[in-house]
């Protein structure tokens, strides 16, 4: 079974800016096992590689400039899973297989790879509970305040796609993904297994918008880390796309920061957890489904108020 995203490979135009961004974002710089690249990891061990955008080892890009070039998904039963994937994907563009992996190109042009999962569960990473009416989960303890974010895991990726129907069908029929919710003719929220968080992949169709990366999202521990991470990025002089805020469609709290690696990077937490019994909702795309509330441009670390336009 596919378990989630474990490796992202980016081709970038500015290595120095990309390295600073990932360090400020709270990812851990470690010695890369791929020559000529930089490697950062989340707390559970997921990997983000930085290549030069013209590195011949990278797959073809789906858009110009700095962007995501390859997504690797983990498998919890690699022997059976690889055999099943090989059977399902053997007629797909870019198909390759070895004893350890299967790879192809999805209908959106993105290279996707599947291999044995290597990320670690982190049961020791706990946070203080939320006190709500009728449910007391924190006693004689204060909620935490975070100086910066330290992402736990890669949560999901979001791509612009000019052919939503074809790409959605590929992930559901070829890879066994589940539809969680949808914007009619506009977007599909997909999770890679029946029981799991709201989405591992979101496909977004906008008229006349070609294939490209919208954002990459990283799980943090709680809403307080969303805020602490975003404030630190403001303090480190990175611009906010939008956030903090909350998505009603998934219940998640978010903060998106513009990234020199392409698209935006998102801190998020509190997304819905679904099972096979969940019935997908198909809604017309509406602003109030994307944001219950949100702050455009972020919060200023000094004033703790909305960033004022220049």
Regions found by a protein language model. Give the residues of each.
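Minor-groove-contacting beta-hairpin "wing" of winged helix-turn-helix DNA-binding domains
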Residues: 36-41, 188-190
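Glyoxalase I/VOC metalloenzyme domain signal
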Residues: 1-31, 42-99, 105-155, 159-184, ...
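Conserved blade-ending motifs and adjacent loop-strand segments that build the rim/top face
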Residues: 244-249
């Amino acid at each position: 079974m596919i378990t989630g995203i474990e490796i992202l490979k980016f081709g970038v135009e500015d290595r120095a800016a990309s390295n600073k961004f990932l360090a400020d974002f709270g990812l851990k710089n470690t010695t890369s096992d791929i020559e000529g690249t930089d490697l950062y990891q989340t707390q559970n061990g997921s990997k983000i590689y930085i290549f030069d955008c013209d590195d011949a080892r990278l797959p073809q890009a789906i858009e110009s400039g700095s962007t995501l070039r390859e997504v690797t998904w983990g498998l919890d039963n690699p022997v059976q899973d690889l055999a099943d994937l090989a059977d399902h994907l053997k007629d797909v563009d870019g198909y390759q297989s070895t004893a350890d992996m299967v790879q192809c190109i999805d209908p959106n042009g993105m290279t996707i790879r599947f291999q044995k999962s290597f990320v670690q569960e982190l049961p020791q990473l706990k946070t203080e509970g939320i006190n709500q009416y009728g449910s007391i989960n924190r006693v004689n303890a204060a909620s935490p305040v975070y100086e910066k974010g330290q992402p736990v895991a890669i949560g999901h990726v979001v791509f612009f796609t000019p052919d939503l129907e074809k790409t959605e069908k590929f992930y559901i029929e070829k890879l066994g993904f589940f539809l969680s919710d949808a914007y009619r003719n506009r977007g599909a929220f997909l999770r890679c297994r029946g029981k799991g968080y709201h989405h591992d992949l979101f496909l977004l169709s906008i008229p006349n918008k070609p294939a490209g990366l919208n954002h990459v999202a990283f799980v943090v521990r709680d809403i307080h880390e969303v805020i602490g991470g975003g404030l630190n990025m403001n303090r480190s002089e990175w611009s906010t796309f939008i956030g903090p805020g909350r998505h009603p469609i998934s219940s998640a709290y978010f903060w998106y920061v513009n990234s020199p690696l392409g698209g935006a990077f998102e801190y998020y937490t509190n997304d819905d957890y679904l099972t096979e019994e969940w019935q997908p909702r198909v809604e017309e795309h509406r602003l109030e489904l994307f944001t219950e509330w949100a702050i455009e441009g972020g919060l200023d670390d000094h004033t703790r108020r909305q960033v004022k336009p220049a």
